[in-house]
Amino acid sequence: MSDIIHLLPDSVANQIAAGEVIQRPASVIKELVENAIDAEAQNIHVLVTDAGKTCIQVIDDGKGMSETDARLSFERHATSKIREASDLFALRTMGFRGEALASIAAVAQVELKTRPESEELGTKIIIAGSKVESQEAVSCPKGSNFSIKNLFFNIPARRKFLKANSTELSNILAEFERIALVHPEVAFSLYSNDSELFNLPACHLRQRILSVFGKKLNQQLLSVEVNTTMVKVSGYVAKPETARKKGAHQYFFVNGRYMRHPYFHKAVMDAYEQLIPAGEQISYFIYFEVDPANIDVNIHPTKTEIKFENEQAIWQILSASIKESLGKFNAVPSIDFDTEDMPDIPAFEQNLPPAPPKVHFNSDFNPFKPSSSSGGGNYSRPKVDWEDLYGGLEKASKMNQPFSDSDPESEEFAVIEEESIATAAPETLYAGELAVIEKGTQHLQFKGRFILTSVKSGLMLIDQHRAHIRVLFDRYRAQIQQKQGFSQGVLFPEILQLPASEAAVLQSIMDDLSAVGFDLSDLGGGSYAINGVPSGIDGLNPVDLVRSMLHTAMEKGNDVKEEIQDILALTLARAAAIVYGQVLSNEEMVSLVDNLFACPSPNYTPDGRVVLTTIKEEEIDKLFR
């Protein structure tokens, strides 16, 4: 039997490794910028073309590399960060595996120019698909200049699955923001297709946060600071009143490295318990400093999942420190006593003797005299107008089963004449049967949530909020497709401030927002003026509405225009729909039901939730047997 096991060529092995380390253009930028930080660079410039698909360039003024180091840096597991296994437990650098450059060179065309400060000439290396094409001396500034062209040029399947430019650029911006937030002492700049997106000078942490996410955040941040023998926790959390359902800026960093940690996220939310509505999120920027020996960063290729040795204790410290900050800055709501209707109590004058209290009594009262109301025999119960409780019910023909004329309850069993709903309603509305609204019926509202109405097969219950979402979704969807949305101008334009990562996504959906009725103008620097909103959304905050649609689009990451249009229509419908608890008149309920049954799919909301259900007449009869 011949041997079948053999070693893979380095180029193939590097491509396999690149599948874990390099997933998209943002991964390349993360690895190169982190290497620049490890090289003690003070200024880092990032330039991308076509969201990094065509070219990524990272320029730094760090230590640079010698000719030998420049060539060796592209070999697998070649690194200057560690020398032995024990160094893994004392890591202070961003990288340590020596895989990044080898992985990048395996799937792209790489050009490196680098020079250490001690040498007059630098080195230029060109590598494509792990093969060194040339290496020569060149004149260049101190530091390193990486140019990554045609990412995944030799793996068409990987390149085909890259997202649209707007999505990939959003991922680049998100990765860039994470690195910039954890290294405020370094100056960063980011350009996309020769357009400047970020220009961040070296500064303090709070100023860096405001430079990335806007100065409006300055009034919302509370500082957090605690130092123990186990961990040092610092950073900022937002005030409770800034909580939102989507779009909160939530960042954890440990020893200068970004991380995701759901367990510590629960600690933050525990500190805000009963301070923010359920389901809403709060912004925070939390920085941990711990002994490197007490954490393990080598459990995931992207190094964003980190294991702590004392997670439970740190959980308690984190939650307590945030609670302390909320109390110290008076962020916890205080008891507000309403003095509007309180009696005016005059100040006590010590010179005057206190007046005795006045007692009112009936001098003619005789407890032994019989009273006409005693004994309870003549007690009359308070009158209850039962007819008002059922005023909305019209009695018509009796039930099919006859009752005796002497039966006093026979007239309570009444039904309402039947009439077909509008022809626009589908023939198979529910369970394959034709739903028929009873003639002349007055719809009833139950608990401010459901609309009850009589149909041919029994009693129909309609969720008023979901029904309105169904109606509005179809309306807004048609407006977006036909670009016939009506815009209503606002007297004072609202200003929307966005970080660069969100602004890039907003630009990609701007046409769809205009189609539904929004009028936005770009003021530059991530600021947008909302000059007009869709008609019919009176009372809604246009800034929150645009943010909601923006963050939904970011979460979905859709590249198909129709799907983005559905997202916009659904978000707008949810925001504008009537809420639970809103009292509706009979005319409003009739209009809502008619519009619902005119929809192509009245049974379900666009996201698949049930809108209506029917209790069959036979099931109701069984309840009275």
Swiss-Prot record:
A GO MF label: ATP binding
GO biological process, one term: mismatch repair
UniProt superkingdom: Bacteria
Pfam families reported for this sequence: DNA_mis_repair, HATPase_c_3, MutL_C
Signal sequence range: none
Xref: HAMAP family: DNA_mis_repair
Name of the protein in question: DNA mismatch repair protein MutL
Origin species: Bacteroides fragilis (strain ATCC 25285 / DSM 2151 / CCUG 4856 / JCM 11019 / LMG 10263 / NCTC 9343 / Onslow / VPI 2553 / EN-2)
Source organism phylogeny: Bacteria, Pseudomonadati, Bacteroidota, Bacteroidia, Bacteroidales
